[in-house]
Amino acid sequence: MEKEVNLYITPKSQDTDNIKDYLESAGVDFNVYDVHADFRVHKRMLEATRGACSAPVIEIGNQIVCGFDRERLEDTLAYELH
């Protein structure tokens, strides 16, 4: 079973744009959640990261990538999705 990829974002963020572009070019399906638009989404992101990260955050299965860390994102996607 393929794991969900969730992207917690803030609007108008260059890192968010970079992550979206990367995931789309890699053919990865992902869900987008705006932490500014919904308090429950913000709370869910904080719980997933244990408060250690601010948006954008990528959640892949139970793995978290904070910000646009291309190398970590590639490694995590390879491990979790393949």
Task: Identify the residue ranges that each predicted region occupies.
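Local sequence-structure signature of Cys/Sec-based thiol-disulfide redox active-site neighborhoods
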Residues: 1-28
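Conserved beta-strand scaffold positions in the cores of enzyme catalytic domains, especially
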Residues: 30-32, 64
